[in-house]
Design a protein with these regions (language model features):
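Active-site nucleophilic cysteine motif
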Residues: 56-69
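...with weaker cross-activation on analogous glycine-rich loops/strands in unrelated enzymes
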Residues: 27-29, 74-133, 139
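Second-shell loop/turn segments in exported
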Residues: 24-28, 48-56, 104
Length: 152
């Protein structure tokens, strides 16, 4: 009897000290995507803005978004207008890391700008002043010019 009590005690001790794995935990894909986008943004921080460009040597806003998302294995059209015209429409309140955000910044049909939403109300974009910058989506400048978002 003493031997059985000892074995039962050992079993309870071992099971009580066993490793518990939370099977409901899944690392956030968006967190990983955001980290990757930050690395990409850093690589493009000195890229001059040149209309029609698509490389780190020179690019425009949609060339940057196309190249950045391609590094995440997401294929999108080349121009701001075609990027806005495709993808799935997303409301501002439902933005997720990697969504494209669009702005009316100039005159005419091509006076648009595009960036990539990060999180916490921030997005990255290739600035016309040169280099990729992270800025607040709800700053007075960008908030007044916001026209929509797309998810790919």
């Amino acid at each position: 009897m003493r031997h059985i009590f000892f074995i039962i005690t050992i079993i309870f001790f071992i099971s009580g000290c066993s490793f518990y794995q939370n099977l409901n935990y899944r690392p956030s894909y968006n967190t990983n995507k955001e980290a990757r986008l930050k690395v990409i943004a850093n690589e493009w921080k000195k890229t001059p803005y040149v209309l029609g460009g698509t490389s780190k040597k020179r690019a425009d806003c949609s060339g940057f978004t196309q190249s950045a998302l391609a590094q995440l294995n997401i294929r999108i059209p080349r121009t701001t207008k075609t990027q806005l015209g495709s993808g799935r429409k997303v409301s501002k309140s439902k933005l997720q890391t990697g969504d494209l955000v669009f702005f009316k910044t100039g005159r005419g049909p091509n006076g648009m700008h595009v960036g990539i939403y990060m999180s916490k109300g921030k997005f990255i974009h290739l600035s016309t002043k040169g280099g990729v910058k992270e800025v607040e989506l709800n700053s007075s400048y960008w908030k007044a010019r916001y026209i929509g978002a797309r998810r790919y």
